[in-house]
């Protein structure tokens, strides 16, 4: 029994060994076939690579030259752009410096202009106040001259110098100029338009005979000349300007009594500058004298001043 079992085991072992040898041989055959196939593929690839390498060696020099030329062109363009950028930066810096200088100049000029404007405004306000005071003085002196003429006519024998039935006019007394009024933008503008350019002379309108306004030029501090109020100037060509009445008019002696005053009987020998030179002559026929205007309205800028190079003095 034991020998039979051993023989069976030996026989099965031999069969298994034979089977393994056959499988091993078939495996080796497949491996050899795969190796041959791979060797053939490698040979084909080597051949193709050799052919391509021969083709590339023909135009490699021209391609290299073209690439170098293109690279040099790009480098030149890059350098040009860098130079242009540098110039633009320099120009920008110069413009920024010029802008800073101009801004400083503008600020300095603006500061200087504001200072000058402040000084001129102060000077203008002072001159306006002085002008207003002098205008008030002129109006007050004009009223005093009217009163002096009235007294002169009454003392010469004309008792009808004032119209009857006007007690308010008879009791009228001129008053000195009032204090300076408060400044307002509108008054300041009117004063600036009528302010004189020369500080020593100014031209003002005065009332003359027959309600005519005589343009006289004289120093502002001098006493007004009473000649226009005492002498008749019928033939003089003077500038006329209507003004509203402030007080009732003073009737002339000629219109009330029909007589001439002693001052009117005198010949006209005095030459008066009235806006242009006027040669006086004795009138052939006496003209009626109008009503005399009294005090101007000072606060409404009624005193007219003109500036001229011609000296117009009485």
Swiss-Prot record:
Residues 176-186 have a biased composition (Basic and acidic residues). The modification Phosphoserine is found at residue 192. Residues 153-193, 251-314 are annotated as: Disordered. Residues 266-280 have a biased composition (Basic residues). Its main location: cytoplasm. Keywords: Coiled coil, Cytoplasm, Cytoskeleton, Immunity, Innate immunity, Phosphoprotein. Residues 1-27, 59-113 form a coiled coil. One of its GO terms (biological process) is innate immune response. Pfam families: CCDC92. It is found in: Cytoplasm, Cytoskeleton, Microtubule organizing center, Centrosome, Centriole; Cytoplasm. The keyword Cell membrane does not apply. Phosphorylated at Ser-192 by TTBK2. GO terms for molecular function: identical protein binding. GO terms for cellular component: centriole; centrosome; cytoplasm; nucleoplasm. PANTHER family: COILED-COIL DOMAIN-CONTAINING 74A, COILED-COIL DOMAIN-CONTAINING PROTEIN 92. Interacts with CEP164. Interferon-stimulated protein that plays a role in innate immunity. This is Coiled-coil domain-containing protein 92. It comes from Mus musculus. The gene is Ccdc92.
